[in-house]
A protein has these predicted regions:
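Membrane-interface helix-boundary motifs at transmembrane edges
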Residues: 23-35, 85-95, 155-168, 219-225
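Alpha-helical transmembrane segments in multipass membrane proteins, preferentially the mid-helix core
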Residues: 19-23, 79-83, 143-163, 209-219
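Individual alpha-helical transmembrane segments in multi-pass integral membrane proteins
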Residues: 2-17, 27-150, 173-176, 195-206
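Interfacial "cap-and-anchor" motif at the non-cytosolic start of specific transmembrane alpha-helices
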Residues: 49-52, 165-233
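Hydrophobic, aromatic-rich alpha-helical transmembrane segments
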Residues: 7, 63-67, 133-137, 161, ...
Length: 233
């Protein structure tokens, strides 16, 4: 078994997101922590899926892991937007329920049909990369819209916030921007852009930056985090 660079990045993503998810889900009584914990689980699905995609020896096996990985990827935009709206305490002009309905539609197509992910092609001599379908193209457009919309909301709040609150939002924007930018390179080979998705490893930096923000800038109340975690132990 050969561990490709793509597989290694997926493994690192899975590890960092698993740690963050465990901490946040331990605090599930706070809705903000719950949403962020579930978001980390969604990214964990991508990381674990990317690992197994990276070590798949044939296209049939890779298709299975692409579908498993996209169980998480499909939920990433709606959970990220939901967290942003809750964290910033603002109302979206587009109801979050619309995004969840769309998410369930894409999830159903991924799990029960071949209209979302159907086949792969060999890329870079080692990766069985998925081939886009019409429905996948629609999903990607929706993904990009939701993520850019969420980042626009964050950026707007940075300009209005002050003091420690501004630092919190700024670190969150930095972490999410790096994570989504790095993860975005994983979409390129889908469309025959022959750039190896090395930057996928940047997704693992997102939980690390968030962890720093939690401790340094009290993005979440670290005293509550420690107290709740010790209670559960």
């Amino acid at each position: 078994m050969v561990i490709t660079a793509f597989a290694a990045s997926g493994l690192l993503i899975a590890i960092t997101c698993a740690v963050m998810a465990m901490v946040m889900l331990a605090l599930a009584r706070n809705p903000l922590n719950l949403i962020w914990g579930i978001f980390c689980l969604a990214v964990l699905f991508w990381g674990a899926g990317a690992y197994f995609i990276g070590i798949s020896s044939n296209g049939f096996e890779a298709v299975l892991w692409w579908r498993i990985a996209y169980i998480g990827v499909i939920f990433i935009p709606v959970l990220f937007l939901h967290f942003v709206l809750s964290f910033l305490r603002i109302r979206s002009p587009i109801h979050i329920g619309f995004f969840y309905v769309a998410t369930l539609g894409f999830l159903g197509a991924n799990l029960f049909t071949h209209s979302f992910i159907a086949e792969t092609q060999l890329m870079f001599g080692e990766l069985h990369y998925m081939v886009p379908t019409t429905l996948y193209n629609i999903f990607l457009g929706w993904f990009v819209f939701a993520v850019l919309f969420a980042h626009a909301l964050i950026w707007n709040q940075i300009s209005m916030a002050q003091g420690s609150r501004r630092q919190q939002i700024l670190f969150f924007f930095l972490g999410s921007f790096i994570g989504f930018l790095g993860g975005g390179f994983s979409f390129l080979p889908v469309y025959d852009v022959a750039i190896y998705p090395y930057p996928n490893i940047a997704v693992a930096l997102f939980p690390i930056i968030m962890g720093y923000a939690i401790i340094r800038h009290k993005l979440f109340d670290i005293r509550v985090v420690l107290a709740e975690s010790l209670t559960i132990i």
